Amino acid sequence: MTKLSGTDSKSTLYCSFCGKSQHEVRKLIAGPTVFICDECVELCNDIIREETKAGLTGRKEGDVPAPSEICATLNDYVIGQDRAKRVLSVAVHNHYKRLKHSGKADGVELAKSNILLVGPTGSGKTLLAQTLARTFDVPFTMADATTLTEAGYVGEDVENIILKLLQASDYNVDKAQHGIVYIDEIDKITRKAENPSITRDVSGEGVQQALLKLMEGTTASVPPQGGRKHPQQEFLQVDTTNILFICGGAFAGLDKIIADRLQKRSIGFGAHVADPDKRKVGELLEKSEPEDLLKFGLIPEFVGRLPVIATLHDLDVDALVTILQEPKNAIVKQYSKLFELEDVELTFTDEALQAIAERAILRKTGARGLRSIVEGILLDTMFDLPDLDDISEVVIDADVVEGKKEPIRVVSNDDDGKKEEAA
């Protein structure tokens, strides 16, 4: 096809779509008997982008995806945790269905159901929240509860969470008011003792008190540029009633509180008392009740704002091996892509993947530790790779993972044969 820009030609050409002449646009692209200008091309791109954002499922804009559809999307990115995914899918479906029908005056007001994710580190809590936001194409922000303090103290105000959500929505207040907020490390703001203290706890119980109104629904006054408030400053008013709050934490030690409660209930002649040490942490967390969270250090009002509790299990070796290679953004796929950009094939043997997963189990870092292990294995190879022209493949086996030898570098001969060359 030919590009024609505006010239002083006798025959003036026009865009077949908008009718503008070649002198009114920057570029006019010629096709068989038709022309299209650069403005129409840009408009077509915008239309395609908007349709892509609306989703590839054929849903009309404003339709709420079914729980099974939400769960299927979560399955593409998160391995295992089937029960947690079902709980999340139903809760989020009901939340956005509530928003869609909130204007109907039938006398029934649907309450908001914020979500608490309980599970060990590296089990997928953060990834679940991120995937949910991607599914609904809504503003999403993450906050670390350990950095939050009460207003007026050194640290980050809880209202800064809403500021981050505004920034994620390009300061579109209406869009931000339907976003998702994920607060990580929520177990780190528990009060220091089960009984109320006479001393001020500005980073524990004080933060829980400050978060209460945000989570229940209030109009937050947010300074557009962040920072501390002062009287002369203009504020953005954000209604948090329809913002979905998801809180996550490892809650280390909660399993022991649950085990103690279950053991007390089993006292008596003929009672079957299971050894708490033989129970898996995930099995105990599934039996968590509000009274356990209160004993852990959350205040009753805060627990009441989190009616939906989803528990996640420790990931076993098989799950970690699957995480390494199957999700859409799997770690092995990411590093294979990096090597592919250097025209080199990266291969992990099954034994190597098993060894990487076992090392992550020993480190007790869950799926989060897989990337650092793979990065350490491939670091020297990635350093040398741009300077090596004859390498066609790099093979990682179990001995490489265990540090017994260097990654196997495969070089190509002129006759397209291959031979192995140790690094």
UniProtKB/Swiss-Prot annotation:
GO terms for biological process: cell division; proteolysis involved in protein catabolic process. GO terms for cellular component: HslUV protease complex. Zn(2+) binds at C15, C18, C37, C40. The keyword Nucleotide-binding applies. ATP-dependent specificity component of the Clp protease. It directs the protease to specific substrates. Can perform chaperone functions in the absence of ClpP. InterPro entries: AAA+_ATPase, ATP-dep_Clp_protease_ClpX, ATPase_AAA_core, Clp_ATPase_C, Clp_protease_ATP-bd_su_ClpX, ClpX_bact, P-loop_NTPase, Znf_CppX_C4. PANTHER family: ATP-DEPENDENT CLP PROTEASE ATP-BINDING SUBUNIT CLPX-LIKE, MITOCHONDRIAL, ATP-DEPENDENT CLP PROTEASE ATP-BINDING SUBUNIT CLPX-LIKE, MITOCHONDRIAL-RELATED. GO terms for molecular function: ATP binding; ATP hydrolysis activity; ATP-dependent protein folding chaperone; protein dimerization activity; unfolded protein binding; zinc ion binding. SUPFAM superfamilies: Glucocorticoid receptor-like (DNA-binding domain), P-loop containing nucleoside triphosphate hydrolases. Transmembrane segments: none annotated. The keyword ATP-binding applies. Belongs to the ClpX chaperone family. SMART domains: AAA (SM00382), ClpB_D2-small (SM01086), zf-C4_ClpX (SM00994). Residues 3-56 form the ClpX-type ZB domain. Component of the ClpX-ClpP complex. Forms a hexameric ring that, in the presence of ATP, binds to fourteen ClpP subunits assembled into a disk-like structure with a central cavity, resembling the structure of eukaryotic proteasomes. This is ATP-dependent Clp protease ATP-binding subunit ClpX. CDD domains: RecA-like_ClpX (cd19497). Keywords: ATP-binding, Chaperone, Metal-binding, Nucleotide-binding, Zinc. ATP binds at P120, T121, G122, S123, G124, K125, T126, L127.
